[in-house]
Each structure stands twice: as C-alpha cells, then as structure tokens.
C-alpha cells in the first residue's frame, strides 16, 4: 500500500478545516507575482481574509473531503499557481479589494497583452540615437524634433490578447510604459450554494448602485399606488391617507380642528368670487375694498404657490440619495 507522508495529510487537513469553518471560500491565481508584491497584497487583506498556497491536488482533495458539497465545483477553476482564500467578506467586496491591490508591471517577451497597448504621441525625452530606429521598427512613428525624439501620433502596437514580442517589450520598458498588471487574480468564489466567477464579480459599482436605487424607488412607488403596506410604504401611505382625508373633509365642509380655518378660508374665497361677478353698485364699500386688495395681492399669491412643488421635488431627491447611500454598503 502506498504510504502518504504525514506532512501532506496535515496540509490537506488544514485546508479542509479552513473550508469548513469559513462562509466564503475562493480560488485565486498567484502566478508571476514577485514575493515582495505578494507580501504587500497579503497586508491589504489584513485580518479580513486568510490566503493559503498549496498544490493543485491538495486543494482538490480538500474540496472533495469538505463537509460542504457545493465547494467541490471550485476545483474546476484551479489555474496557474492556485491558492485558496478564506473570508467572511461578501464576494464582491473581496474581488474589489484584490483588484485594487494590483499594480502596474513592465511587459515581458511572450506575455499576453491584457488590453490594446498604445504608445501616446509626445516627446520621449530621448536624444537622437539608435532608439529612433527601434521605435520605428516596432511600428511607432517617431522623428527628431528640437533635439529630442518625438512620437508623432498615437500608435497601437499590440492588440488585446496578442503575445508581446521581445522588441516591443524592450521598447515599452525604455519608454516606462507598463501595460501589465500584477496581482492576485480571483478566479471563483463559493458562497452558500452559489459559485461566482470573476466575470460576474467584475461590476460597475456606480451603475449597479444607481440601477438598484431606481428599482427601489420604483418598488416604493408601486407599493404606494397599489396600497401595499410594508415597512417602507406604510409612512407614505399614512401621509397620503391623511392628505386625502383632509381634502375630503374640506370639500364636504366637515368642521374639525384641522379643517375649520381652511373651510372658512374657502368660503371667504368663494364669497369674493361671487362678489366679482356683481357690479360695483350692487356691493358695499367694504366688500369693494376687499376685492381691490385681493387683486393687488394676486401676483404675490402666484409666486408663493410656485415654491411648493420644489419642496416636494427636494424630498423625493433626498429619499433617492438615502436609498443609494444604503445600497453602496453592499460593495464595501
């Protein structure tokens, strides 16, 4: 019978225990990360996550032996130099922290361009010399201008996904253009019964928060108009019911402590409206004076009324901003 070294068993057992004791388990790729930068990235995680490097087969065995059946699917995402990350952070926050910790790196011959590599037009600060020919050789339009070498136009020299030739890598390094990114690549994360891949976790935060805020506002509007009571709509529905009840009481001339002043004001306004239809000879001097006073005050009343909708709009904006601020917490 083949003997398995104790240290191997211990490594697998450690990964199993960490998998069973953490809510969020991720698979990352640490390939091509210098030791110094890896140490810096570990510090960026702080006490929020545990990063464990191990062999692929050790990780596979640990996932298979785990008490959580759903984590077995993570074995499909083992690439490069794999490692496991254990945390309580939600997957989106973990992804953001790892992405933010990435740093620029110079291109190496044979590396795959992560995006189109463009050399911008402008002064290179290099004096006339052999580098002019090197630039032109890799497709960068350059000339000598006022004692230095100048790139005359923006030049795309490598397309996204293409291999970077040695000559291009060398010239990019001389120009101090670092098109590569060095960092911990989060490949997949398991939370509960769901496995999130990197393409799902890579979202536009502002756009997502705005979309959720709009959906929240639409849901509130629907619940209010449909009369659906919940913790969010109840205060608005009560306010609406109070306004409707007040309007009904005023229009029906039902006297209460809330409506008496308004009904009297309405009756007074109606009296003045009727008086306007009569000739000045049919009404007394006191009423004529009131009609004249009302006519003089009319423009002011119109100006006051135009301010009310602005207040309502401000209240709606405040509600939307509060909703967006709360949703922002989802992404740390």
From Swiss-Prot:
Q: Name one GO molecular function term.
A: structural constituent of ribosome
Tell me one GO biological process term: ribosomal large subunit assembly
Record flagged with keyword Glycoprotein = no
Q: Name one GO cellular component term.
A: cytosolic large ribosomal subunit
UniProt entry keywords in alphabetical sequence: Ribonucleoprotein, Ribosomal protein, RNA-binding, rRNA-binding
The UniProt entry, under Gene3D superfamilies, shows: 3.30.70.1730, 3.90.105.20, 6.10.140.760
Stretches of Acidic residues bias are at 304-320
Q: Which domain of life is it from?
A: Archaea
What the protein does comes down to:
Forms part of the ribosomal stalk, playing a central role in the interaction of the ribosome with GTP-bound translation factors.
- What's this protein's family per the entry? Belongs to the universal ribosomal protein uL10 family.
Q: By what name is this protein known?
A: Large ribosomal subunit protein uL10
Organism listed in the record: Methanosphaera stadtmanae (strain ATCC 43021 / DSM 3091 / JCM 11832 / MCB-3)
């Amino acid at each position: 019978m083949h003997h398995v070294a104790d240290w191997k068993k211990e490594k697998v057992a450690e990964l199993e225990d960490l998998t069973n004791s953490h809510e969020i388990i991720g698979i990352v790729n640490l390939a091509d990360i210098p030791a110094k930068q890896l140490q810096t990235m570990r510090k960026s995680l702080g006490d929020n996550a545990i990063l464990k490097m191990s062999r692929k087969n050790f990780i596979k065995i640990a996932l298979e032996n785990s008490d959580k059946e759903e984590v077995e699917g993570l074995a499909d995402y083992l690439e490069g130099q794999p490692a496991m990350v254990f945390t309580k952070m939600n997957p989106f926050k973990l992804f953001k922290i790892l992405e933010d910790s990435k740093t620029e790196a110079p291109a190496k011959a044979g590396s795959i361009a992560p995006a189109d590599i463009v050399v911008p037009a402008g002064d290179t600060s290099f004096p006339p010399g052999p580098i002019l020919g090197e630039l032109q050789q890799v497709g960068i339009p350059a000339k000598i201008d006022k004692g230095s070498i100048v790139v005359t136009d923006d030049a795309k020299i490598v397309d996204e996904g293409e291999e970077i030739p040695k000559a291009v890598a060398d010239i990019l390094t001389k120009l101090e253009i670092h098109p590569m990114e060095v960092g911990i690549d989060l490949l997949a994360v398991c939370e509960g019964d769901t496995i999130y891949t990197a393409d799902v976790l890579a979202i536009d935060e502002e756009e997502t928060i705005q979309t959720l805020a709009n959906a929240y506002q639409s849901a509130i509007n629907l619940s209010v108009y449909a009369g659906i009571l919940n913790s969010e709509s109840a205060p608005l529905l009560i306010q609406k019911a109070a306004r409707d009840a007040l309007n009904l009481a005023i229009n029906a001339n039902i006297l209460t402590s809330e409506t008496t002043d308004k009904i009297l004001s309405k009756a007074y306004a109606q009296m003045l409206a009727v008086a306007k239809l009569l000739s000045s000879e049919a009404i007394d001097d006191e009423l004529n004076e009131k009609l004249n006073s009302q006519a003089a005050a009319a423009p002011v009343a119109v100006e006051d009324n135009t301010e009310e909708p602005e207040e309502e709009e401000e209240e709606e904006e405040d509600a939307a901003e509060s909703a967006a601020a709360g949703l922002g917490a989802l992404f740390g």
